[in-house]
Amino acid sequence: FGAPVDETFTRRGDRARWKTTSDAGDQRVEGTAIYSSLAGSPEAATVLLGALAKRPDGRLPLIPSGTLTSRRVGEATVRRGEESRTVDLVMLTGVGFTPQFVWATRAASPRLFAYLVPGYLKLIEEGWQENGAALATRQQAAEAQALVDLERRVAHPLDGVTLIRNARVFDSEHATVGPPADVYLFRGRITEILPASGLDAGADHVLDAGGRVLLPGLFDMHTHLGRWDGGLHLAAGVTTVRDMANG
């Protein structure tokens, strides 16, 4: 948004050094690793894709930390006049809280072909712009399927009665924490709070809080929701949001 960019990275032997407008670092690095820039551009994906293609395990260590992985989640045939080519939709994970989707050329050393943020941004190789809308549609479908797959892996449906045992309930109205209690839930609602007893009273699911504090769901009063934000909110304890729209 117009802020100055001043970022450098160097590696000499096993020492890596970097400096940005936000931080600076110096660390020892063994073997192959690539710097994850703070103020880079989408074109950096070309470097990442090429480096990943040379890794037999499909994993690329990152500097300062983390590991980048890639998975092909789709393909498309794009056309420019009489010319056509096949490009792959690649999902990159390991940078940020959500995957990044990029379109890559199909080659031994792939490069970035298109970077799309549907409804907001389209970057595509010169001359192939007419394929942008079709690629965006395919990308949205692949992203939706990725979210469905994630939900199937991490969701834990709690049918019937759930007991949260030995929890200390936070009272937000009086800013106090109560004694150990057993909290019963049914269909997503608290039905009863009783003194901790160690009994399960026929509950279908039992979670042992181990004396930890049980907080009510948090409210986020200023959000601009995207497709991946729901899971991130839940992970942070936020159960209610007010979306300020995305215009």
Predicted feature locations:
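Divalent metal-dependent hydrolysis catalytic cores, especially in the metallo-beta-lactamase
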Residues: 230-247
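Histidine-rich, glycine-flanked metal-binding segment
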Residues: 174-215
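Divalent metal-coordination and catalytic microenvironments
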Residues: 110, 167, 183, 188, ...
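Solvent-exposed helix/loop surface patches that form functional interfaces
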Residues: 4-89, 138-141
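Short, hydrophobic/aromatic-rich segments at coil-to-beta transitions
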Residues: 14-17, 83-91, 111, 160-165, ...
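Gly/Pro-enriched, hydrophobic low-complexity segments
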Residues: 1, 86-124
